[in-house]
Amino acid sequence: QELGYLGVLANYIREKRHGDHTFFNRNFHIEPTNVCVYDCKFCSYSRLIKERAEGWEMEVDGMMDIVKKYDNEAVTEVHITGGVVPKQNLEFYADFFRKCKAHRPELHIKGLTPVEYYYIFKKAKLSHYDGLKYLQSCGLDSMPGGGAEIFHPEVREQIAHDKCTAEQWLDIHEQAHKLGMHTNATMLYGHIEQFWHRVDHMERLRQLQDK
């Protein structure tokens, strides 16, 4: 009931700002790897580095093979997100974005979450802004909202203790906005969090929107 009421309020604001318009797209998903340096408590499919024999780590050519499978379909977007591994670094994704745009320029690239970017940019010794600007020049168009989970440290420390912090997650999105990129956000709820943790999460997102 509370969620439904929240949806009514959200729709009121949406209609006030955008009128009676709704956006749909046709996308496909590429998950470059299910191997991950992080050990989130809720993740049931990823494999740690020490378990990588049970997982997969794609190369750029393999990712492009997936893109090419959709050559004769009216897709509008490729959505890329997965685990975090050292070999899939800044230049790995720069190479893929370039090749993807060269092959199909009109295809919108919604790529990677702040969790991946925080790790990649730290390894590359780049600021969030400079890293995103570089990848934007390679073809990145927008950013998905995964990895937000629950922002409050009381919960985040228990379920995803080694991921980027809420502040780092929000800053990466803020830098993307400064570059003119659109982003979205998620919230993982229904586990150990309380209602006020959800409110805190959405309030932080609203504050970022207000900026």
Set out the residue ranges of the language-model regions.
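An N-cap/entry alpha-helix motif that binds or orients negatively charged groups
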Residues: Q1-F23
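Canonical Radical SAM [4Fe-4S] cluster-binding loop centered on the CxxxCxxC motif
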Residues: K16-G62
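Conserved radical SAM core fold
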Residues: I49-K50, H79, V84-K87, P114-F121, ...
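Glycine-rich anion/phosphate-binding loops
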Residues: A53-D65, L90-E91, L126-Y129, A166-E167, ...
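Short Fe-S-cluster ligation motifs
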Residues: M64-G83
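Generic structural signal for well-ordered alpha-helices
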Residues: M64-V67, Y93-R98, L132, L170-H173, ...
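Conserved glycine-rich "GG(E/T)P / GGGxP" loop and the immediately following alpha-helix
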Residues: V78-H103, I120-A124, E193-H197
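Conserved C-terminal portion of the radical SAM core fold
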Residues: R104, S137-A148, E167-K211
